[in-house]
């Protein structure tokens, strides 16, 4: 992963994962006293941070002898991006992959998963990720040679962020980072990346991000929201809650508006959870005590995956009603 076998040509698609760029946010940060740089996980080979764990969970299971290409059936509940991270890996390695996903996730996700040859089963959106997890467990019980990768419980998830994302951010900022801002889905990114960064400098602050509508880490109740990929409605096993200094709440509407602003003002087309993370990072960077500090925010996915979602609803209608001039 990330270390090409020849100076210029990668051995296969797995060597393209990681080493994503960092870029300053310049206009949406008006009024901030701290600086904000985005880690563009939207520039992974399959356009999301989940490419890292798709690689790590499959590789880890192979090394432990739990799965064998051509024989094992991989099963996983997903909100979409982990499914895509697993699907391109499964295609490259020759695995049958069965995914369960809430029906509320974007149409692009369904199409991309099928394009990679994954089998997809939709679950009741009202049951959220819990419903997808239950369905995956049912399928595994009746499918021979099946293996659930369990992104919410799998130690290979935070481990890859500890080994790659954390060091990349530390190196990319020259060790000058003061805080990390990351949305919490499985919790793998903030747990692994955060652990590495705090080992380098214990003063680095870790800020989680969750939907206002499902603010369970702040003691609220799980509820429906529009920020695909974060706010699973339960506390995942891989999330180390003790490592987090503060979990910031951002509403679905705030997240959508910020994602739109990032495209219009920064030239960055990103998903709704990136909007949530950016909105949280800006709140932190506006605090007087953070003057001159550098915050890195993780942008988990590319905006094109959300064309059918509420993020682009008004633009889609406008585009569909256009006429030849």
From Swiss-Prot:
Give the subcellular location. Cytoplasm
Which GO biological process annotations does it have? cysteine biosynthetic process from serine
Keywords tagged on the record:
Amino-acid biosynthesis, Cysteine biosynthesis, Cytoplasm, Pyridoxal phosphate, Transferase
SUPFAM superfamilies attached to this UniProt entry:
Tryptophan synthase beta subunit-like PLP-dependent enzymes
* Pathways involved: Amino-acid biosynthesis; L-cysteine biosynthesis; L-cysteine from L-serine: step 2/2
Q: Name one GO cellular component term.
A: cytoplasm
Instruction: Show which residues constitute the signal peptide.
Output: none
Q: What is this protein called?
A: Cysteine synthase
Q: Which organism is it from?
A: Triticum aestivum
Q: What is the lineage of its organism?
A: Eukaryota, Viridiplantae, Streptophyta, Embryophyta, Tracheophyta
